[in-house]
Amino acid sequence: MPRRSFNGATVLVTGAGGGLGRAIAEQFAAAGAHIVAVDKDAAAVASLQATLEARGRACLSLPCDVTDPDACARAVAAAIERFGALDVLVNNAGMSHRSGLADTDLAVIRRVMEVNFFGAVHCTKAALPCLIERRGLVVAISSVAGYTPLIARTGYAASKHALHGFFESLRTEVAPQGVQVMMACPSFIATQIDRNALGGDGLPVRHAQVTIGRPLTADAAAQQIVAGAARGRRLLLVGRTAWLAWWVSRLAPAVYERLMARRLRGELESGTNTVRTTERKPRP
């Protein structure tokens, strides 16, 4: 498969206000793409636009809540109006939680699913006609939690597993029309997503995140993602930890579960925000 060039392409990145999304936008811009930076934080994407324009790159920043399908449709329409086309959609917007299910309000899990899964669905649905016309590319930012279990993040893992089912099925629908779909699965990244994670009561968690392996920088992960997109990768495991998790979880799933739980179980026991509504009575 020939290497895809992004020079002159229009790339829409959700969650582009900071962290991995901003780094992805900067990497695509460095490859010559026109950037449409979408984020709920209007000031953050306006800052990115100013940075890219100072480098001589074209960028349109748009405030957008990806949980609103109409807002996603307006963002896609604005991108096409400004640049005449849309070639690449990067579904990066996301959030996390850190709490055991027993201590998690169901509204937290619904919120995570709305942002991580339905946000990607909304944007992809809106962009699909233009992507088909342009024989474009959809990138879905998943996670190691998209193909393995992850303790204390049941809702987050469910949202990432759902992305795989959705986009791998979509690939079979749009491949005949020349549209490519890439799943990118980073391991832990040093960004705000886990610093802003919700606890079981929907408030920001108060305890520090536990990681496996050395967290990637956003720039390092973004470089791999853009390079993988150019090569036409279907599945991109980003970072050594992601590769190890993939193989161990498939060759020895029970071993993987024990190792992962041993490392991360402290997140269930480190003073998470709690939403228990009943008290366990001591045995007589």
Describe each model-derived feature in a short phrase.
Residues 124, 159:
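Active-site helix of classical SDR
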